[in-house]
Amino acid sequence: KIRAMELIDDVERDARGPYCGAIGRIGSDGDAAFNVAIRTIRLTPGENDKHKAVLGVGGAIVADSDGMGEWRECLIKSAFVRGRAGGHDLIETMRFDPEEGIALLEPHLERMKASAAELGFAFDRHDARNRIQALCFELEEAAKLRLMLTRSGAIALEVQALPEALGEPATCLALPHPTVAGDWRLRHKTTDRNFYEEALAMAQAAGAKEALLVREDGQLTEGCWTSIFVERDGILLTPPLELGLLPGVLRRSLIEEGRAREAALSLSDLEGGFLIGNALRGLIPAKVITP
């Protein structure tokens, strides 16, 4: 037993947690009840802040065990959870230009790879890049390119005309944030965008082009399809990711270039003018309107 645990410590990257041990209770009268903790979902405060739970799955590996067979056993044991996973897809929306191609292709693929790893999607980044590049060779005009990824790893590409210009300044309506900062949907670009769509519909009904989401503490997070920027002393300020918002590709590019940095923003910070933007449209001057 001791030697086995020494070997496990050498070859396994992470601690196994409680799933391969026992869990139980001891009453004040000395009565005890214990059971193994397999098929037990562990939820800790730190993980719950990110709306994330952990399920440990494994098997009894012996000298003649087959690696693929053990992996199939793990899939069978975890099927009761995996079968209930959300039916959403991951998406990336990119801008194709005949002269420049897709300028931010690698950051788009990197974001999808990170989301796929965290949410349990299969993703072949090399294959996705090759298929995008092959499609771009067929395009002659600027276009909107949408990459979609299913949980199983299937990729789909859509080409659409670029959206019409919004006009400047683009009108925005401030609305209460519809969810909590720990909602996983804020950190990943998926087809599960109902709360964004509802907020945007409210803004459009009031005559605005975009909705600005405001937390209960008054801090701005993002728009429904854009990041928010305020220029101060030649630097663009944009809300921090920790507040609960999408890590936008344009946003990341501007930060890495030294043109932007994270800072807390409220509606009062927008009074002198601000910008909204994404990788498809670039930066757009904007203003807040009242309903």
Locate each region found by the language model.
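Conserved hydrophobic core element of enzyme catalytic domains
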Residues: K1-G86
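Helix-start/capping segments and mature chain N-termini
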Residues: V36, P45, D66-K144, M148-P291
